[in-house]
């Protein structure tokens, strides 16, 4: 009886060694090294491991919930990105001073155009204790070339150009207030914009001109 049990145990041991040949000393060390260094399993074991029901279910959830998000600023050139950052900084500063919030939309195509021009937006016209009114309007946006000329006459201040309305009109807009009466608010409607050269607060000249002084070209 003891001899039969020993023979059965020896046969079982031989079968185990044949069934798992990769558990030899060299193969076992290689397998452990792969695990410690976070390498992938061999193809045969990796496929069987990932085909288990638990991993199939989790893999399906990951594939459904995983969405790639790309930053739109990655597709903008350096100059357009710089203008967008300056514009966003100006909007944040103005947002702290004005109420209700005023949104000035500006797209990538407008950022790539450097010259001053008019862009459409919806203006919030408001007054204290009155209901605001949303009015289609335009705002001026773009770059203007400023310059400094040595020898400029002492009586004239140095010019500075800015993007400003070149054609606009003013209207009176009625606002309905909480007390029941109407309040009239004057609003400027901008139609076109261009670069203007400013010498002081009260003097505005077309861009590139100077009174009694012509730079040598």
From Swiss-Prot:
InterPro entries per UniProt: Cerberus, Cys_knot_C, Cystine-knot_cytokine, DAN
GO molecular function: morphogen activity
Signal peptide bounds: 1-19
Taxonomy, superkingdom: Eukaryota
Keywords: Disulfide bond, Secreted, Signal
Induction context: Down-regulation during the establishment of embryonic left-right axis could be due to translation repression involving BICC1 and DICER1. Subsequently transcripts are degraded in a DICER1-dependent manner. Attenuated DAND5 expression lifts repression of NODAL and defines leftness by induction of the left lateral plate mesoderm NODAL signaling cascade.
Disulfide bond annotation, renumbered to this chain: 116-163, 130-177, 140-193, 144-195
Task performed by this protein: Plays an important role in regulating the left-right axis by blocking a tgfb1 cascade in the right posterior paraxial mesoderm. Functions as an inhibitor of bmp, tgfb1, nodal, activin and wnt signaling in the ectoderm. May inhibit mesodermal signals, probably through an inhibition of nodal/activin pathways. Seems to regulate cell fate specification and competence before the onset of neural induction.
Subunit structure: Interacts with nr1-A.
Cross-referenced PANTHER family: DAN DOMAIN FAMILY MEMBER 5
Full protein name: DAN domain family member 5
Organism: Xenopus laevis (African clawed frog)
């Amino acid at each position: 009886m003891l001899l039969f049990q020993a023979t059965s145990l020896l046969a079982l041991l031989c079968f185990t060694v044949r069934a798992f040949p990769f558990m030899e000393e060299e193969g076992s060390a290689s397998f452990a090294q792969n695990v410690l260094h976070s390498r992938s399993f061999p193809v045969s074991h990796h496929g069987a491991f990932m085909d288990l029901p638990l991993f199939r279910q989790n893999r399906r959830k990951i594939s459904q919930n995983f969405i790639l998000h790309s930053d739109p600023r990655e597709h903008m050139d350096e100059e357009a990105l710089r203008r967008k950052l300056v514009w966003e900084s100006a909007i944040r500063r103005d947002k702290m001073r004005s109420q209700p919030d005023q949104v000035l939309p500006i797209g990538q195509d407008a950022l790539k155009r450097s010259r001053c021009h008019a862009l459409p937006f919806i203006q919030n016209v408001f007054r204290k204790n009155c209901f605001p009114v949303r009015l289609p309007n335009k705002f001026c946006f773009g770059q203007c070339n400023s310059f400094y000329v040595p020898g400029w006459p002492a009586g004239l201040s140095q010019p500075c150009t800015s993007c400003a309305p070149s054609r606009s009109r003013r209207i009176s807009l009625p606002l309905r207030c909480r007390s029941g009466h109407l309040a009239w608010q004057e609003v400027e409607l901008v139609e076109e914009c261009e670069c203007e050269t400013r010498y002081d607060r009260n003097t505005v000249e077309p861009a590139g001109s100077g009174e009694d002084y012509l730079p040598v070209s």
